[in-house]
Amino acid sequence: VGKSTSHGCTGFKISNDNRDKNGDVNMKKIKIAYISTTGLDVFPLITALEELETEKGDVAEVILRSKDDLADPKTMDDFMSFAVGSDLAILSLHGGKAILGSFDEIAGRLRDANVPMYAQDTSKLDPELMSISTVGRDVHTSIFRYLAYGGKDNSKNLLLYCLNQFLGTSYEVGEPKRPPWEGIYHPDFGYIATLDEYFRKNYKEGRPTIGLWFYSGFWQADNLRFVDSLIREIERRDANVIPVFLYSLKDVELGTKGAEWVIDNYFMKDGQPVIDALISTLMFSLTMKPRDEEKLFDKPFFERLGVPVIKAILTYNTEEEWRESFQGLNPMDVSMSIAMPEFDGMLIAVPVAAKKMTETDTLTGAKLTRFEPIDERVRKIVSLTLNWAKLRHISNQEKRVAIIFHNYPPRNDRIGTAFGLDSPVSVYNILRDLEGEGYGLESLPESGQVLIESMISRVTNDRRWSSPEMMAEKAIDLVPAEQYRKWFEELPGAIQEKMVMSWGEPPGELFVHQGELIIPGISNGNIFIGLQPPRGFLENPEAIYHSPDLPIPHHYYAYYRWIRDVFRADLVMHIGKHGSLEWLPGKSVGLSESCFPDIAISDLPNIYPYIINNPGEGTQAKRRSYCCIIDHLI
C-alpha cells in the first residue's frame, strides 16, 4: 500500500479480503496522530469515533494529545513513536504554530518519517502553516473546513474522508456542513434560532433580564456545565436569562455573523436593549483590532447596547490551583480574560469556571477536560450582575447611594484627600447633579466645605478628640454585637480565624462602645456620605496600609455590611485615588470568597472616579473591587 507524501492520495491496490461491516473496502484502519490546543474538538471527535466503530467496525485509530500533555517528555516520546508510523498527523493549533512550543521538532520528525501532515490554525487559514503542511492544498482545505465547522457529524465525515484519501477506501462522505454559529441555548429547550421563539417559551414580563454569551465551540462540544450553572442561578433569582452561543468574529468564508450581529438580533429589539446587563464569558477584545489597536467600529456595539457588561472568567487553572495560588490567575488568563476585555469597557469580576480533567478516553488516550463551574463564584457574579441590572428598574427617587470619602491617615484634616481631585467640591457637584436627576436628597449643602464641616460635627474616623461614648451618641447608627456576630459567622472559617487572631473576638475593640460598632457618616435622604474605615490602629497606619497579610478589622467589615444590609445601598461610589479596599489581602486577580476586597464590597455595584494618569493603580481597583472606573483629568 502506498502512502502520499505531498497530496494525501495515491494509487492503491484494492483487496476484497478486508471489508467493514457494510461491505465497503477497508485495507486497514487509518492511524491518525492528532494534536489539539483547545480541547473543544476532542469531545465531538470521540463521539464520532464511537459511532464509526459501531457502523463500520475498527477502521480508525486516533491518538490525541494536548499541548499540555506534550510538555511531559515521556508523553511526547510515546506520542511521536505512534505519530512517525501513522497515516496522517493533524496539528490543530489555535493561535498558530507559536502556541505549540515543540512544533518545529514535531514537524521535522514527521517530515523525516514521510508522514502526511496537516497543520493549521483552528479558525483561519494561516499561509505559513499551509506551506509547512505536506498534504495537498485541496485536502488541506477540506480538512480545515471539517475541523473549523466542528461538531460530531463533521468529525465523523472527516474520518471517512481521510480513510478515502489516505487508504483508498470508498466510503460515502458528507461535505463539511456549517453548524449554527449563533443561537440561543437553554438546557430545558436545546437550540432555539430566534429571540421571538425563545420569548414565547421562556420569558416573564416585569423581571430583570440578563444576557449571557459564550463560544459556540462550547455548545458544539457539549462543554456546557458552567453555562447551565449560570442559567439556573439567574433563574433561581427570579430573573430572565437569554443565553446565546456565538462565534465572536464575522467571517464570510466560515459563515459566522459575529458579536455585533448577535447583539442586534438577540440582545436588542427595535433598536432598544431587551437585557439589563450582560455576562460575558468571551475572551480577548471584541472591539479592537489585533496589534494596531485601531477600533473596528465607528460606534462600538457595546455603546449602542448601553448596559453593563460583566466579565466572567474561565480560568485554565484547575480550581485547586486557583484556590491555592496567591496570584490567582495565570498569565494567559490575565491576558485573554482580563487585560484585553478591559479595552471593551467590561467590568472585571470573578472566575466562574475552572479547567478540570474528568477522565481519560479509552479510544484516543486523550485527557478529557471541561470547564467545571465554581458554584460559589457563580452565585457571586449572578448577584453582582443582578444588582447592576436592577438599577434600570429602580426610579432615581428610590435609588439609595453610598458615597465614600477616602480618609488616610484617619484624621479629620485628611478627609477626602484623593490625588489630583478636590474631593469635597466633587462630591458637592455629584450631589447637585443627583438632585437634578431626581434622586432623593433632603437638601443640598451650600458647598463642599460645608459638607465636610457637617461630617466633622458628627462622628469620623478621628478618635483623638472624642470618647467612645461621644462617638456612639453622634454616630449615624450602631451595629449590635448580635447582628455583627451573624454577619461574621457567614465568613469562611479560615477568615474568621485570621480576624480573631489579629483583632480579637467579634466585635473587637476598634470603634466599639458597649459591644456596639460605631458607624461614622451622615445621611441626606437616600444618600449616605461616609468615610472609608481605617485599616488598623491610628498609632501606626502606614505600617499596615498596603499590608498583603493583615486582615481587616471587625469594624471595616461591619461598615461595608451596614452599607449593604442596613442602609440598603443600591450602589456605592468611592471618590478618587485611592482607598484601601482594592489593596486588602487576597489574590492579585481572580478573587475568591476568602479575599478581603471581595468580602468587603460583596455584590455592590461600585463606581470609582479615578485620575486618568495612574492606570496601574486604577487597574488594581478595577480588578480587585469590580468597579466601573470613571476617569477624570489631572
Model-identified regions with their sequence ranges:
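An N-terminal assembly and electron-transfer interface module characteristic of large anaerobic redox
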Residues: 5, 9-634
